[in-house]
Amino acid sequence: DGYWSQYKSDVAAARGIDETNFDETLEGLLSKFEAAGGDFAQYALQNNWVDALKTREEVRLELVELVGEDDNELGVNLTSFNSYLKVINPPMPVIESDMDKVAIVVAKGTILDGNQKAGTIGGDSTARLLRKARLNDKVKAVVLQIDSPGGSAFASEVIRQEVLQLQQAGKPVIASMSTYAASGGYWIAASTDKIIASPSTITGSIGVFGMFMTYENSLDYLGIHSDGVGSTELAGFSAVRPLAPEFGQILQRNVENTYGNFLSLVSQARGMTVEEVDSVAQGRVWLGADAIDLGLVDQLGTVDDAVVAAAEMAELEKYDTFYVKRTLTAQEIFWKEFFGQAMTVVGKWQFAHADSALVNEFKRVLREVSVVSKLNDPKGTYVLCLPCDIK
C-alpha cells in the first residue's frame, strides 16, 4: 500500500492530476471505458495519462519540428541512447589525482557464497573490493551502494566483517540503499555508520530460512529410485532421497541460531533492544520512508547524499569519488569490447523479435527458478526476501 501510494503521488505530481484518478473501481472503469468507445487510447487520453494520440509518422514530424532533420533512417536529428549516456555520465578519468577519495562499492544482485561476476554479489569478491578500499591510503571513506534482496547468510556475514574492518581502520562506511536492501541486503548495511535509503526502497525483511532441496517424489514419478548404506543416519544424505528428520532438526536449529544472530547484530548496530528489533523483524518488509520511524534507516536520500555524508564523516573538504571495481581478465576485456560493439545490432534484432506474452511468462518462471538454483550457502541458511519483486 505504501509503495502504491508513493507511485500515485509521484505520477499525479508529474501529470498535474489528482491521486483519486488512480482509485478506479471496476464499475467506474467500465463506465469510462464505455464512454471512450472501448478504446484504451481514448480512455488514457480522457484520464490525462497521455497528452495526445498520434501515429508514428505524426510523432516523427513533430520531432523534426523540434530538432530538425537528418540522413538517418528516421530522418530525425536524434542522438542514440548510448551516446547520450556517455555525455551525461562520461567514463571516469584514468589519471590518478593526489586528492583524498570517497570510494563507492556496488553490491547489486543476489548474495552468493564465493567469487561471483557482476550481476550477483559474491561474499568473497565483494569483500575483496571493500578490502581494496581499506588498503588504499587515499581512500578516507566508503559508500556501500546496495541493491539486493539478500541471499546467503554466510556470504552476508563475510561482507559485513569487511565493513567492520574498514571502520576499525578509521574509514567511515555509509550504506546507500537503492531499489532493495532487504534481508541479507540489510544484514550487510546494518553495521555501517549511517544508512541512507530512498522513500520507496524496500528494506527490512529481517528473517532467515533454511533450504535443502530433494527430488525423491519427482524421481519416483519417473520410476527412478536410489538407495545406499552409510556409517550413520546422517551420512550420505542426498537430494535424491527424503531428508532425514534428524537433519531437518539440525537445519531448523541453525536457522533459529542465525535469526538470533541477525537480531543481535541489528540491535547492537542500531542501538535498539533485541525485542525492539524482533518487533519489526520476522521477515516483514518496509518502505524506506517507514523504516526511518522504525529505526532501521537514518536518512532519505540518494547515493550522492551518501557520498556527501561519507565525506563529512571523514572531515574531507575536497575529495574525488571513484568506483572500486575488480580487475578484469584479458578474456573478459575481449568479450566486453566484442559485445559492446555488437549491442547496436543485437538491440535492433531484439526489438524486431519482441517476445510474446507466453515467452515472457516462461522467462519469468525461469528467472525465479534460476535464483533458487544458484543459492549456495554452505549451511543452506538464507537471509533472502523471496517476495521482493515490484510489479
Task: Place the predicted regions along the sequence by residue.
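Extracytoplasmic and endomembrane cell-envelope/extracellular-matrix remodeling and assembly machinery
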Residues: 57-104, 336
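Charged, glycine-interspersed solvent-exposed loop segments at helix/strand-loop junctions
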Residues: 1-64, 216, 220-310, 314, ...
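C-terminal intrinsically disordered, low-complexity extensions immediately downstream
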Residues: 305-337
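Flexible, acidic/glycine-enriched loop-and-adjacent beta/alpha segments
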Residues: 54-77, 176-232, 301-317
